[in-house]
Amino acid sequence: MQIRQSVKFKKPLIHYITNPISINDCANMILAVGAKPIMAEHPLEVSEITSISESLGINLGNITDNKMKSMLISGKTSYEKKIPQVIDLVGVGCSKLRLDYAKKFISECHPNVIKGNMSEIKAIYGIKSSAKGIDVGECDIITEQNFDENIEMIKRLSMETDSVVAATGVVDIISNGTYTYIISNGCEMLSMITGTGSMLTGIIASYISSGNILEGTALAIAIMGICGELSQNVKGTGSFRNELIDNMFSISDDIIIKKIRINSY
């Protein structure tokens, strides 16, 4: 839990270029874990903003020409200055524009973390996926039957890109090619409100700011799942959203240790 307490103590500045659909919730979630968000996206200022930040988050949801330009500028600045960065592959399974752009970004900016659902991870690896818009396709969901082959693919992608790869879903797989974590926390309601994946990327950006990339990514994913579990006994999805942010703000180390379901592979 040292990573979590370090973020609360240091309050790192997190530059997150994300989509307008969830930008407010993303900023609030970064605040909830103790970091400070800045959501700048103008091409003429993003390099300067990234330079003074401790971490960078890149989200491919709802992209535009200007935002694509800004993301590449920030990504290159982050790489040059050794600032940790995470890219969220939103929609690369259903959009050639996003897929081609994501490949270019990974090649030129070398993000520390590549995050996506299994459809998005398969697409970036070069395997045909069955993505349903930005959601994971039914055929791509991790099952007992395809578990081992998906882990091997994730490990290979990690080694090829020199990035931690985080495949999120009912079961989360996080790997740096050598060490792999399997996380089984979460609940169905996390997929029933928009933006929870984008919020998670903001938390990952916050937790990797210390430079502990694999553990920071795994911790962020586990805590998001636990907070989902703690928040689900509510009237509906609107209440769930608010409860999720509240639990992220107030959750204790003791509850995390008690509820975390994580295994190494």
Swiss-Prot record:
EC number: 2.7.1.50
Cofactors required: Mg(2+)
Lineage top rank: taxon: Bacteria
Record: residues binding ATP: 115, 168
InterPro entries assigned: Hyethyz_kinase (IPR000417), Ribokinase-like (IPR029056)
Record GO terms (molecular function): ATP binding; hydroxyethylthiazole kinase activity; magnesium ion binding
The keyword Kinase appears for this protein: yes
Signal peptide per UniProt: none
Pathway entry: Cofactor biosynthesis; thiamine diphosphate biosynthesis; 4-methyl-5-(2-phosphoethyl)-thiazole from 5-(2-hydroxyethyl)-4-methylthiazole: step 1/1
Binding sites annotated in the UniProt record for substrate: 39, 195
Keywords, alphabetical: ATP-binding, Kinase, Magnesium, Metal-binding, Nucleotide-binding, Thiamine biosynthesis, Transferase
Pfam families hit by this protein: HK
Catalytic activity, as annotated: 5-(2-hydroxyethyl)-4-methylthiazole + ATP = 4-methyl-5-(2-phosphooxyethyl)-thiazole + ADP + H(+)
Top EC group: transferase
GO biological process entries: thiamine biosynthetic process; thiamine diphosphate biosynthetic process
Membership in a protein family: Belongs to the Thz kinase family.
Protein function: Catalyzes the phosphorylation of the hydroxyl group of 4-methyl-5-beta-hydroxyethylthiazole (THZ).
Protein name per UniProt: Hydroxyethylthiazole kinase 1
Upper taxonomic lineage: Bacteria, Bacillati, Bacillota, Clostridia, Eubacteriales
Gene responsible for this protein: thiM1
